[in-house]
Amino acid sequence: RDRSVSRGLGDVYKRQIEGKPDDLVINTHVCRGNYHSTYAFEGGYDPIAPYLFANEDVDAFYLEFDTPRAGGFEPLRYVAPGKKVVLGLVTTKAAELEDEDAIVERIHEAAKYVPLENLYLSPQCGFASCEIGNKLTEDEQWAKIALVKRIAERVWK
């Protein structure tokens, strides 16, 4: 049943972008909720990966991997060749900065499934995905962005 629902939604999505201009970039973000520094859902990408990552007609997937509740990188093995994967490894839900070396290590772990040249780094979601936003100050948000920049410069020299 879950597979038929996924396929049905995928078919609706495909019809929505049929005939899009060649230069229109389509990306998708798989969100688990981001309301005032809390989340709504947990669990890995395993149940949806075989269909979503292999079949969704997008240029890139923006995926949350900021906590263990997101599961491992193994489902990335289903990502179709040439697709980009943006790894949301830096949380927008807490002010504490992630360890740079640990993030670099996780990027290389993800590269076992998707070539490094097709991987990107970002915060796991927006800093204010809804009107109330998250419990981070503006300075804390800029520190997270600076962290992403530093790590990206290390990994993709």
What feature does the model see in each segment?
Residues G33, P47-K157:
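Catalytic-face loop-and-helix region of soluble metabolic enzyme cores
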Residues D22-Y35:
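Aromatic-lined carbohydrate-recognition surfaces of secreted/lumenal glycan-active proteins
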Residues G19:
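TRNA-recognition modules of translation machinery and tRNA-sensing kinases, especially anticodon-binding
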Residues S4, H29, S122:
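Short glycine- and Lys/Arg-enriched binding-loop motifs that mark or flank ligand-binding interfaces
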Residues D2-Y13:
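Single conserved hydrophobic/aromatic residue that forms the stacking wall/gate
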Residues A40-G44:
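Ligand-binding pockets and gating/stacking loops
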